[in-house]
């Protein structure tokens, strides 16, 4: 029996084949290559051997991060010789990892290496039009990941460990259910050497501490500890699928939409729903638990509160919960300090499109042949109609700015007298975090607010039966309104 046949019949190869079939990791009939993340360690070396034996077209990818001096160069030389031996194409990348980390604020050396590695893999994935990128994580790696996550506090997603497949098949882990014992036995029979990272013995590194100090204690409790945890991981994967199905079928698809507190309190596992809907806000579990406790109090539920997360805020407002990301908060801050003078009124007939931090403004002028229907024309809250000829006579100096002055008064069309701007914003359910950034059209000569975008307009320059030309100013927001209003703000009689 040839060595190849011996290796093909090895338990490692059988386990890899089962894993590939069970999770549908690879298309056996495809001629597209598989990118192998090859470090030169035992795991990735066995992975390359196994997939090559199973007949897949492999391209190896090796990164030299220059973090371990001569050892890094030794690894590169080893994988070069290995790929020559197996007749596998090798793609290499050399990185100044320390330089990358220092050039990117807040990025550790470990994070830098990860970003550089996956950027390189992604580039190869596109260049080769590859089936996928195969990673060498094995069963023991997954057990260690579970223990690390458990020590930090984790839910189902953290305790089910690494998945066999992620990013819709872009990354796969054919060894994820394979014991390292099989890996070492396979390499022994293949008479295949491998390299060892000297830092793997450093127990000041968290994963190494788990591997060398903590894991052996569990093995004393149960010699089949890895297999026991593997069974638990499979159960947790199923539970995660059930949880994801429940969340997906219960929550709105758009995470910018508000959650009604009364509705949330009636649901199963409301904390899990909060975690999912406001995932981009990155709120601590204790913060979300406090939020739920506050929502259980009917008096508090209707009042305003703000809950901080690492990625933004959640606001409790008028019986709803609304999330705003840090990116959106930054845009709102920019809009608060933004002021834009509109072009001279005489130039409006040519049309204009202007940029704003929260959207875009389009100005158009129409003549009587394009007038609204004789009875009623309804516009969105983001459109403003004015009599163009009245405007030309008055010649106001118009600008768009933020509603930062809470003491300002506005005379809305259809209402008696003047109303405080702050009250109009409250009545329109504008979130407190967004009020100061609400766009308004102001006549600089008189200080009059002509249009509070998305809320109301004044009676100035409104259309009449005598109107011959009219201008339409449209604000197209790029920031969705969580309390989208469908009020018909503009009703024009003819």
What residue spans do the PLM features occupy?
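Repeat-unit-sized solenoid/scaffold elements
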Residues: 126, 210-218, 474-484
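Hydrophobic/aromatic-lined pockets within catalytic cores
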Residues: 151, 219, 278-282
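AMP-forming adenylation/ATP pyrophosphatase catalytic core
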Residues: 2-40, 63, 95, 116, ...
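Contiguous mid-protein beta-loop-alpha structural module that forms a pocket-lining wall or clamp
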Residues: 172, 177-264, 268-276, 321
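Core alpha/beta nucleotide-donor-binding catalytic domains of modification enzymes
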Residues: 2-216
């Amino acid at each position: 029996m040839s060595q190849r046949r011996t290796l093909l019949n090895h338990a490692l190869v059988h386990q890899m084949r089962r894993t590939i079939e069970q999770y549908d990791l690879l298309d056996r009939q495809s001629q597209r290559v598989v990118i192998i993340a090859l470090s030169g360690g035992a795991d990735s070396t066995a992975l390359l051997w196994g997939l090559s034996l199973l007949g897949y077209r492999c391209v190896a990818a090796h990164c030299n991060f220059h973090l371990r001096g001569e050892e890094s160069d030794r690894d590169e030389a080893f994988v070069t010789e290995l790929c020559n031996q197996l007749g596998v194409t090798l793609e290499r990348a050399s990185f100044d990892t320390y330089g990358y980390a220092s050039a990117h604020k807040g990025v550790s050396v470990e994070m830098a290496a990860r970003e550089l590695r996956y950027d390189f893999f992604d580039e190869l994935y596109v260049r080769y039009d590859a089936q996928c990128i195969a990673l060498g994580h094995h069963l023991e790696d997954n057990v260690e990941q579970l223990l690390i996550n458990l020590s930090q506090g984790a839910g189902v997603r953290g305790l089910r460990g690494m998945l066999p497949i992620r990013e819709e098949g872009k990354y796969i882990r054919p060894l994820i259910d394979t014991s390292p014992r099989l890996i070492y036995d396979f390499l022994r029979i293949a008479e295949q050497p491998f390299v060892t990272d000297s830092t793997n013995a450093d127990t000041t590194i968290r994963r190494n501490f788990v591997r060398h100090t903590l894991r052996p204690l569990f093995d004393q409790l149960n010699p089949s500890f890895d297999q026991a945890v593997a069974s638990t991981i499979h159960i947790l994967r199923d539970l995660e699928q059930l949880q994801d199905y429940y969340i997906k079928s219960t929550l709105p698809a758009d995470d910018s939409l508000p959650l009604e507190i009364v509705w949330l309190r009636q649901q199963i596992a409301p904390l899990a729903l909060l975690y999912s809907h406001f995932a981009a806000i990155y709120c601590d579990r204790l913060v979300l638990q406090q939020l739920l406790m506050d929502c259980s109090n009917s008096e508090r539920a209707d009042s305003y509160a703000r809950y901080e997360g690492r990625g933004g805020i959640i606001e409790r407002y008028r019986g709803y919960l609304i999330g705003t990301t840090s990116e959106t908060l930054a845009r709102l801050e920019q809009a608060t300090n933004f002021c834009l003078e509109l072009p001279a009124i005489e130039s409006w007939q040519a049309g204009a499109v202007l940029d704003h931090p929260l959207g875009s403004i389009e100005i158009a002028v129409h003549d009587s042949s394009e007038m609204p229907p004789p009875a009623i024309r309804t516009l969105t809250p983001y459109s403003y109609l004015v009599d163009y000829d009245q405007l030309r006579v008055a010649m106001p100096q118009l600008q768009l700015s933020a509603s930062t002055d809470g003491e300002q008064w506005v005379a809305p069309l259809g209402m008696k007298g003047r109303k405080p701007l702050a009250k109009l914003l409250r009545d329109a359910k504008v979130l407190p975090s967004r009020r100061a950034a609400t766009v308004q059209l102001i006549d600089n000569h008189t200080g009059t607010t002509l249009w509070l975008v998305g809320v109301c307009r004044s009676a100035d320059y409104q259309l009449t039966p005598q109107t011959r030309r009219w201008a339409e100013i449209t604000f197209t927001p790029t920031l969705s309104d969580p309390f989208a209003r469908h009020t018909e703000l503009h009703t024009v009689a003819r």
